[in-house]
Amino acid sequence: MSRILLTGFEPFGGEKVNPSELAVKQLEGKTIAGLEVVAGVLPVVTVKCIDEAVKLIEKYEPVAVLNVGQAGGRVELSIEKVAINVKDYRIPDNEGNQIRYAPVVEGGPDAYFATIPVEKIADSLVEKVIPASVSYTAGTYCCNEVFYGVSHYLRNNKPGVLNGFIHIPFILEQAAGAKPPRASMPLEVIVKGLEIAVEVVAEGLEK
């Protein structure tokens, strides 16, 4: 059976949980639209985040890769269109590195577009009454770094493998009692949204 790799991240920035980790773990081992879901958790550490993602790709040999990350402040699922070759951390990573104005890959292309059907995923989520839209900025932190690094690796080593990135909001337990108030989404809605995204990716693979 063909596999799709979903990755989340460990908690960072003082948070006790990372909803991306929780969400991908809930889908791990399931079969969705004929694809076996395999999953992994990436460190929020420059370079190591890409290295771990590549190890998972080489281990599982998926037909598609969907990286997922927390974006506090977003109010919906953001289906990312483009990864840029920039690292500019507003906060340190989990090993204290605060990279400024550096490339993800020295000499690499300025950007990579997602190869999953970004617009169709966003439209399908909205049709299923899950707030979502296409996003044109994945930031300049570890999420974008992984999105770019995975894109670069796949284009150069496994060009037939589809990939993309989805940013998700905080979950309720991160928002309850927060000052100032935080936007949030129930974890079960996020999980359902990712399941729909996998279904759309699977449809694209069949064509």
Curated annotation (Swiss-Prot):
SUPFAM superfamilies: Pyrrolidone carboxyl peptidase (pyroglutamate aminopeptidase). PROSITE patterns: PYRASE_GLU. Disulfide bonds: none annotated. Keywords: Cytoplasm, Hydrolase, Protease, Thiol protease. The keyword Iron does not apply. GO terms for molecular function: pyroglutamyl-peptidase activity. It is found in: Cytoplasm. Gene3D superfamilies: Peptidase C15, pyroglutamyl peptidase I-like. It is an enzyme of class 3 (hydrolase). One of its GO terms (cellular component) is cytosol. GO terms for biological process: proteolysis. The active site is at 80, 143, 167. Pfam families: Peptidase_C15. It catalyses: Release of an N-terminal pyroglutamyl group from a polypeptide, the second amino acid generally not being Pro. InterPro entries: Peptidase_C15, Peptidase_C15-like, Peptidase_C15-like_sf, PGP-I_bact-type, PGPEP1_Glu_AS. Removes 5-oxoproline from various penultimate amino acid residues except L-proline. Belongs to the peptidase C15 family. This is Pyrrolidone-carboxylate peptidase. The lineage of its organism: Bacteria, Pseudomonadati, Coprothermobacterota, Coprothermobacteria, Coprothermobacterales.
